[in-house]
A protein has these predicted regions:
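Redox-cofactor binding/interface segments in oxidoreductases and associated redox assembly factors
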Residues: 74, 80-81, 144
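Glycine-rich phosphate-binding loop and adjoining beta1-alpha1-beta2 segment
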Residues: 24-58
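N-terminal Rossmann-like dinucleotide-binding module
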Residues: 4-30
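Short acidic low-complexity segments
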Residues: 62-75
Length: 429
């Protein structure tokens, strides 16, 4: 049977939804799912909900749990990582502390100081997991959901022999957002994109049934500058392609939308209190899950929705020799011709008997490729700083970021964030 290990299962909402996806994937019946998390209480809650889901659907899934990933990896076929060291407190620090130095962004999990320190906390753990996989399950596929996606996947590819892909729901969310503008249901739209995670650009958008090219309609809507996603539509007007990922993510890559001149994001409806609201929402969802786990009469199937993620479907395809096409983060190696070969890029990928293969796509417009290339160099500095624990490289990652206006402030910010993250930065001690 297929053995799937979910590391970070205590990221409760994601963990439960991934279990739900697996439960409802017919081709994975008989599989063994191992839940792993260092938070024993959260792990037990997710395990109880998973047990409910399996029983309600008679899913024939074997479910087990443990707190140490090293105990779970032996013989695994797939290892899914959804880890976020430091939790909500670290995430809030990633956004709030830099704001005092003029770094204004919403999500803060990909680029700049927030992305850097999430990388410094997370990359060593995921690389350690991959190194353990080299001994315990060398042929397994690592499927990463943790952010910053590009940097984490690059670190695994660069410093281990483990095959790794990264998955994100950005394109699905974009299709859902633009479908009302096109007068269609999301299911009526087929879209593909390329770029880097949280900064991919729609290359194709067609009607799923008729094959009609929907890009001209999207361009026409952009001329009216809709109030929803004004940054994305502004970029469509500028570059001729529509960026996927949502404005809250996109502004981490392009600093002027949250500059003082743009009212710190107000001119483009960017909410700099995004993280506080997200943390409050997560807390509410967690309370609902705790109730679901502890009240026998509540049905898990009625309460849990799937993720719109593709991990379960990809595992089904790979395990049962099916062909599917998905958005994946993989090493570039020429797939996007005008981006660095060693970079991790997000492109369509096809499941094959030998794994998930990213497809060759067209070169991106020069203006977009130039921005992405600068980001790729920033990610490379994050990887090196995280793996080697070098403050100098972390500073260089800050200095290359377009939000940085002062070396002195960048050094002060770096010291403050290192101190705030001290429990999670073993490599800097």
């Amino acid at each position: 049977s297929t053995k799937i290990v979910l590391v970070g299962a205590g990221s409760a909402v994601v963990g439960v939804r991934l279990i739900s996806d697996l439960v409802f994937t017919e081709g994975l019946r008989g599989s063994h799912l191992v839940l792993v998390d260092i938070d024993s209480e959260r792990l037990d809650m997710v395990y109880r909900i998973g047990t409910k889901l399996i029983a309600e659907q008679d899913a024939k899934l074997r479910l087990s749990k443990c707190e140490d990933y090293r105990e779970a990896l032996s013989g695994a076929d797939y290892v899914i990582t959804t880890v976020a060291r430091g939790g909500a407190g670290a995430w809030l620090n990633d956004v709030r502390i830099p704001q005092a130095y003029g770094y204004n962004y919403a999500v803060g999990d990909t680029m700049g100081p927030g992305g850097l320190f999430r990388a410094l906390r997370t990359i060593p753990l995921v690389v350690d997991i991959a190194r353990e996989m080299e001994e315990a399950c060398p042929d397994a596929l690592l499927i990463n959901y943790s952010n910053p996606m590009t940097a984490i996947c690059r670190a695994v590819n660069k410093y281990t022999s483990i095959r790794a892909i990264g998955l994100c729901h950005g394109l699905q969310n974009t299709v859902r957002r633009i479908s009302p503008r096109l007068g269609l249901e999301p299911s009526e739209i087929t879209a593909w994109a390329s770029g880097i995670n949280h900064f991919i650009w729609l290359t194709d958008i067609v009607h799923s049934v008729t094959g009609e090219d929907l890009y001209p309609k999207l361009v026409e809507r952009a001329k009216k500058m809709p109030s929803e996603q004004p940054v994305a539509y502004d970029l469509l007007n500028t570059y001729g392609l529509f960026p996927s990922g949502g404005d809250d993510h996109i502004v981490e890559f392009i600093q002027y939308y949250t500059s003082h001149e743009c009212g710190k994001g107000a001119a483009h409806n960017i909410d700099l209190n995004y993280v506080e609201k997200a943390v409050a929402h997560q807390k509410q969802e967690l309370e609902e899950l705790e109730k679901l786990a502890s009240v026998p009469s509540l049905r898990a199937t009625d309460a849990i929705q799937g993720t719109a993620e593709s991990a379960a479907e990809i595992i089904d395809c790979l395990s049962n020799a099916k062909t599917g096409v998905f958005m994946v983060n993989v090493p570039n190696n020429g797939r996007i011709p005008n981006l660095p070969a060693e970079a991790v890029v997000e492109v369509p990928g096809i499941t094959t008997p030998s794994g998930v293969m990213g497809v060759q796509v067209e070169a991106l417009p020069l203006g977009i490729a130039g921005r992405i290339t600068a980001c790729i160099h920033e990610f490379e500095l994050m990887v090196e700083a995280a793996v080697h624990g070098e403050r100098r490289l972390a500073l260089q990652a800050l200095l290359i970021n377009p939000f940085t206006r002062s070396r002195v402030d960048a050094e002060r910010l770096l010291d403050e964030l290192i101190k705030a993250n001290e429990p999670y930065l073993e490599q800097f001690r």
